[in-house]
Amino acid sequence: MLALWLFQRFGLDVATTGMIFFVTGLCSAASYFVAVPLARRCGLVNTMVFTHLPANFFLVLTAFAPNLWLAFVLLIMRSLLSQMDVPTRSSYVMAVVEPEERPAAASLTAVPRSLASAIAPLLSGWLLSASAFGWPLVLAGLLKIAYDLMLLQQFRMVKPPEES
C-alpha cells in the first residue's frame, strides 16, 4: 500500500518505486546488526520501544511530506530504525518464557502481525480511495506508537535473565 500511496501522492514511476524499496530494504537489513550492541547497552525492551517509536513518528511524518525527496528521506530514516525490534523481540520472548512454552510464545507474537498484515490492505485501500492523503500511514504510525507505549508499560519491569 505504501507503493500505491507513493504513486497516488507523487506520481511515482515503477522504477523509482523499486529503487526506494531497495534502499529502504538495505537500511532495514543493516539495522539488524546495530540492534545487537544497542540491546546489550540499553536492554531488549528499551531497544524495541525506543527504536520503534521514532520509526513510527517518521512514518506519520511521511504522510505530510510536501515532496518525494522528503518522503524518501523519512522512509529511509524509518527503515534504519523500524526493524530493530525484530531480533530483540525474538530474543526477549525466548529469554522470558520457559523452554517448553517457546514455540507457543513465538506463534503468539507472530499472529497479531499476520492479522494486521491481512487487514491493513483492505483498510488502506478504502482510505486511499476516499482521499489521496496518507491516512494509512498516519493510522499505522499511530497504532504502532500506541503498541510501543503499551509494550513499554507492560514489560519494562520484566527483565530477561541476562539483564537482571
Can you annotate each of these PLM segments?
Residues 1-17:
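Short amphipathic helix-loop junctions that connect adjacent transmembrane helices
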Residues 63-75:
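Helix-loop junctions at membrane interfaces in 12-TM secondary transporters
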Residues 31-44, 128:
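Helix-to-loop junctions at the C-terminal end of transmembrane segments
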Residues 4, 8, 119-138:
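Transmembrane alpha-helix termini and helix-breaking/packing motifs in multi-pass membrane transporters
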Residues 84-97:
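Intracellular juxtamembrane helix-capping segments at the cytosolic ends
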Residues 139-164:
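Multi-pass alpha-helical transporter architecture, strongest
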Residues 14-15, 99-109:
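Loop-to-transmembrane helix entry/capping segments in MFS-fold secondary transporters
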Residues 46-61, 141:
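Structural signature of the two symmetry-related core transmembrane helices
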